Amino acid sequence: MGAQLSTLGHMVLFPVWFLYSLLMKLFQRSTPAITLESPDIKYPLRLIDREIISHDTRRFRFALPSPQHILGLPVGQHIYLSARIDGNLVVRPYTPISSDDDKGFVDLVIKVYFKDTHPKFPAGGKMSQYLESMQIGDTIEFRGPSGLLVYQGKGKFAIRPDKKSNPIIRTVKSVGMIAGGTGITPMLQVIRAIMKDPDDHTVCHLLFANQTEKDILLRPELEELRNKHSARFKLWYTLDRAPEAWDYGQGFVNEEMIRDHLPPPEEEPLVLMCGPPPMIQYACLPNLDHVGHPTERCFVF
């Protein structure tokens, strides 16, 4: 009798164990491994491809630990690259243009500041020139996620006033964005996250400032998104030095541009900014204030 009960117990337990094992394997397959497991750890990633986008802009692709890994970067956050250059530790923040929909790699689009091209900065950019000098197969250290803003979807943003504070949740129907130069990368990250979700009806208004037409980073990607999602993504450029045949704005970001190309204050939008500090301090913030956008609804990456 005891032997029969033992056999019966094994017969009952085996299907349960088998089903549990199968479910665990399916769960593991459906849950990709995360590269950035801790924001306090540096993860060396290997350069596997480099694409020349323009005379001074490159797309760098780095391999994640396995083809099944994702980076693990929430939308709105950035990473830090660190390298020892000329005996000194150099750390710089960057926002990837790839997302956690991409497995096995992370892409960075970076403008290379070459030496002897800008009179105020004759040495050029330390990190960007270091990246330019890297060979395929070389590694560089990534750390993150970092940042005070996370986009949670459906118009919901979690924003921390500082690193120690709890996030404040803001839900909006429209987002104003002002980007200058390489400041476009965090904007593109948020725009893509919104546009890929057909149930996210948040409308994005991007005002993108550059010096010349050839300086416009990621223009094909932006215009493809605009053409595909014209009801939800509004795009306007302004150039310091515009060509004669130019269909967009000219000059620095000003009050008129903000009135014409960002959502009005009455819609209670969130306004995101990223660009050179002088642009933010002297062009964006004062003119946003003149138009009526309150400080608490403005965020600078």
From Swiss-Prot:
It is an enzyme of class 1 (oxidoreductase). The keyword Lipoprotein applies. A lipid is attached at G2 (N-myristoyl glycine). FAD binds at R92, P93, Y94, V109, K111, F114, K126, M127, S128, T185. It comes from the Eukaryota. Its cofactor is FAD. Changing C204S: No effect on NADH-cytochrome b5 reductase activity. GO terms for molecular function: cytochrome-b5 reductase activity, acting on NAD(P)H; FAD binding. Residues 40-152 form the FAD-binding FR-type domain. Changing C274S: No effect on NADH-cytochrome b5 reductase activity. GO terms for biological process: blood circulation; cholesterol biosynthetic process; nitric oxide biosynthetic process. The modification Phosphotyrosine is found at Y43. Its EC number is 1.6.2.2. Changing S128P: In METHB-CYB5R3; type 2; Hiroshima; decreased NADH-cytochrome b5 reductase activity; highly increased Km for NADH and decreased Kcat. Gene3D superfamilies: Nucleotide-binding domain of ferredoxin-NADP reductase (FNR) module (3.40.50.80), Translation factors (2.40.30.10). Changing L73P: In METHB-CYB5R3; type 1. Pfam families: FAD_binding_6, NAD_binding_1. Changing R58Q: In METHB-CYB5R3; type 1; 62% of activity. The modification N6-acetyllysine is found at K42, K120. Catalyzes the reduction of two molecules of cytochrome b5 using NADH as the electron donor. Component of a complex composed of cytochrome b5, NADH-cytochrome b5 reductase (CYB5R3) and MTARC2. Interacts with MTLN; the interaction is required to maintain cellular lipid composition and leads to stimulation of mitochondrial respiratory complex I activity. It is linked to Methemoglobinemia CYB5R3-related: A form of methemoglobinemia, a hematologic disease characterized by the presence of excessive amounts of methemoglobin in blood cells, resulting in decreased oxygen carrying capacity of the blood, cyanosis and hypoxia. There are two types of methemoglobinemia CYB5R3-related. In type 1, the defect affects the soluble form of the enzyme, is restricted to red blood cells, and causes well-tolerated methemoglobinemia. Belongs to the flavoprotein pyridine nucleotide cytochrome reductase family. PANTHER family: NADH-CYTOCHROME B5 REDUCTASE, NADH-CYTOCHROME B5 REDUCTASE 3. This is NADH-cytochrome b5 reductase 3.
